[in-house]
Regions:
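Conserved glycine(s) of the Walker
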Residues: 14-15
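Hydrophobic anchor at the beta1->P-loop junction of P-loop NTPases
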Residues: 7
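Inter-motif core of Ras-like GTPase G domains
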Residues: 128-152
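N-terminal phosphate/diphosphate-binding loop that engages ATP/GTP or pyrophosphate donors
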Residues: 4, 18-94, 98, 105-106
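Short internal beta-strands
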Residues: 38, 147-150, 175-181
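Charged helix-capping and loop-helix junction motifs
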Residues: 128-136, 161-164, 189-194
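Switch II (G3) loop of P-loop NTPases
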Residues: 100, 104-131
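C-terminal lobe/tail of nucleotide-utilizing enzymes
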Residues: 165-230
């Protein structure tokens, strides 16, 4: 039975893809059959033949060393570095939930662990045309629990607590927090983490420092965060 989890963050550019790559790498190095998935990806470069390179997917693939084909990692790839709802409108290929779900289910039939990354923060709109799809709709459709990625630095208390409270109010399960850009011994960052734990009731699962090549979490603890795919 395949298991999966969703990776969301407190916002854009807080290191979701970097941390996701380390998560998938940890699973793969344990011998687990691991896959990566993302519904929509913006801000991608083009190959010489004009096709788009799914940058986040390529990063995770290179970081983790998984053999999963790149073309199975993301059904919607956009060139414009905008929120997916706007990039898709400009480029004429709006996200459709059945397509996202089909790609996910195919991976569930082939891999033991699926790590699905979101776009931006939890309020990121995925499609805002005839269909209105928020990131939370994707999470609910696939019935996934989440890990919350946050920066350890100044301002994170507000971002973490607001994100956690929003998700709790919408019955979205959060298994815990991974803090990125953490500097061991930094008094402010240590206090930020302590306050986030106190104000959200969520555990800190790992701390990632700049340049880390491994995720410092017990592999069994990591695997147990994943829930069975329905």
């Amino acid at each position: 039975m395949s298991k999966a989890i969703f990776i969301t963050g407190t916002g854009t550019d807080i290191g979701k893809t970097y941390v996701t790559g380390l998560i998938v790498k940890k699973l793969a190095e344990s011998g687990a059959s691991a896959a990566y998935y993302k519904a929509a990806m913006s801000g991608n470069d083009r190959r010489p033949d004009g096709s788009l390179i799914p940058g986040d997917a390529l990063f995770v693939k290179n970081t983790s060393g998984i053999a999963q084909p790149l073309e199975t990692m993301c059904p919607y790839i956009y060139e414009n570095a905008y929120s997916p709802h706007l990039a898709s409108r400009i480029e004429g290929t709006p996200v459709e939930m059945p397509v996202v779900k089909e790609g996910f289910q195919k991976l569930a039939g082939e891999y033991d662990f699926i790590t699905m990354e979101g776009s931006g923060g939890i309020l990121c709109p995925i499609c805002f045309d005839e269909a209105k799809i928020q990131l939370e709709d994707v999470i609910k459709e696939l019935n996934l629990s989440s890990l919350l990625i946050a920066d350890a630095g100044l301002g994170t208390i507000n971002s973490v607590v607001l994100t956690a409270e929003y998700m709790k109010a919408r019955n979205l399960t959060i298994k815990g927090i991974i803090f990125n850009n953490y500097h061991p011994g930094n008094i402010m960052e240590d206090d930020n983490i302590r306050m986030c734990e106190y104000m959200t009731g969520l555990p800190t699962l790992a701390k990632v420092s700049p340049g880390d090549n491994d995720l410092h979490i017990d592999i069994d603890v990591l695997k147990n965060l994943y829930d069975e795919v329905n």
